[in-house]
Amino acid sequence: MRSQHVLILLLGLVCASQVLGKHLTKVKAKALHYDKRGDCDWPTGVCFYIHDPCPPGLRRCPQHDDGCYLPTNHCCCYP
């Protein structure tokens, strides 16, 4: 009888961990997707090397510099 209770408990833990694991994976995927996008991606702007000027037609927008993946980049925004 005791081994049946242990088995049921183990099966319950395995099922719960499977459900929780899938949920955490989806949450992590959403967070990763948001992190990958950044604040300086299209349609906002494009990241360029910090010592290069923004190309013609784009304006410097330092408020989005943190959205660039590399600290040596700055953001140039579309008008």
Swiss-Prot record:
One of its GO terms (cellular component) is extracellular region. It is found in: Secreted; Nematocyst. GO terms for molecular function: toxin activity. The keyword Signal applies. Keywords: Cleavage on pair of basic residues, Disulfide bond, Nematocyst, Neurotoxin, Secreted, Signal, Toxin. This recombinant protein induces severe neurotoxicity on zebrafish larvae (Danio rerio) at a concentration of 230 mg/ml, but does not show toxicity when injected in blowfly larvae (Sarcophaga falculata). All fish incubated with this protein died within 200 minutes of exposure. Has also been claimed to be implied in calcification, but this function seems improbable. This is Small cysteine-rich protein 2. It comes from Acropora millepora (Staghorn coral).
